[in-house]
Amino acid sequence: MVLGGLMKLFDEFKAFVMRGNVVDLAVGVIIGAAFGKIVTSLVNDIFMPIIGMIIGNIDFSSLVIKLGEPVEGAEQAAIRYGMFIQEIVNFLIIALCVFVAIKLINKLQKKKEEASAPAPGPTKEEVLLTEIRDALNKIAEK
């Protein structure tokens, strides 16, 4: 009895996991995590050093506002606004990449929909003009 219930539960779980949306979501999360690491490296290792050099050889990761006096054996309390600036740049680059990707996907989907859409039928005006033409042709034949 218990084994049958477990098998049914396993079958339901397998059906759930194999649905397209769940698999697509899992792939998206994995690719997103890898992409996040690439963007973080791009910002930290390429963009921020260039920006720091342009504005006076500043290392953004070292920009802090120290709070109070350091306590022996503990890390200095500080507001690390330089790291915050780096995270903002990270976010903006990721947002830009996602925006461009979505625009590209939407453009491709629109082209696909336009290609697969059936040709529109004649408009009311075209039908009326065709009827008038046919009527005039009948009159001309008499």
Swiss-Prot record:
| Membrane topology field | Multi-pass membrane protein
Q: What does this protein do?
A: Channel that opens in response to stretch forces in the membrane lipid bilayer. May participate in the regulation of osmotic pressure changes within the cell.
Q: Which NCBIfam families match?
A: mscL, PRK00567.1-4
GO molecular-function terms, A-Z: mechanosensitive monoatomic ion channel activity
Q: Which organism is it from?
A: Fusobacterium nucleatum subsp. nucleatum (strain ATCC 25586 / DSM 15643 / BCRC 10681 / CIP 101130 / JCM 8532 / KCTC 2640 / LMG 13131 / VPI 4355)
Q: Does the keyword 4Fe-4S apply?
A: no
Q: Which residues cross the membrane?
A: 15-35, 38-58, 82-102
User: Out of the domains of life, which is the source?
Assistant: Bacteria
What is this protein called in UniProt? Answer: Large-conductance mechanosensitive channel
Q: Which GO terms describe its cellular component?
A: membrane; plasma membrane
Q: Name one GO biological process term.
A: monoatomic ion transport
SUPFAM superfamilies named among the record's database cross-references? Gated mechanosensitive channel (SSF81330)
Q: What is its main location?
A: membrane
Q: Which UniProt keywords apply?
A: Cell inner membrane, Cell membrane, Ion channel, Ion transport, Membrane, Transmembrane, Transmembrane helix, Transport
Q: How does it assemble?
A: Homopentamer.
Cited InterPro entries? Mechanosensitive_channel_CS, MS_channel, MSC/AndL, MscL_channel
One Pfam family matching this protein = MscL
> S-adenosyl-L-methionine among the record's keywords?
no
The protein's location, in the record's own words, is: Cell inner membrane
